């Protein structure tokens, strides 16, 4: 199941030349994911994935107890998150 994209997830689309499709592809092709905090509902996770052109993206996704998923942040991965892939 793919998450819904919140408007805030599109903040860096122009600068990083992202599209809804590239972000959802990267989400589906995650290389790493981890929780960002200890919250119960919604749970906030960092997801690092690769899009169709090989770019590594960082995304933040909210997972709700009801089963919903909302992607609230997407951009080209910063160095701090790339280093986690080593």
What are these model-derived regions, one by one?
Residues 1-86:
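Ribonuclease/tRNase effector modules and their secretory precursors
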């Amino acid at each position: 199941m793919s998450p819904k994209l919140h408007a805030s997830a599109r903040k860096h689309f122009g600068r990083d030349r992202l599209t809804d499709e590239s972000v959802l592809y990267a989400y589906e092709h995650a290389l790493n994911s981890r929780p960002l905090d200890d919250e119960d509902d919604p749970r906030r996770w960092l997801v690092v994935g690769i899009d169709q052109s090989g770019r590594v993206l960082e995304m933040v996704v909210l997972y709700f107890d009801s089963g919903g998923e909302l992607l609230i942040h997407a951009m080209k991965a910063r160095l701090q998150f790339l280093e986690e892939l080593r």
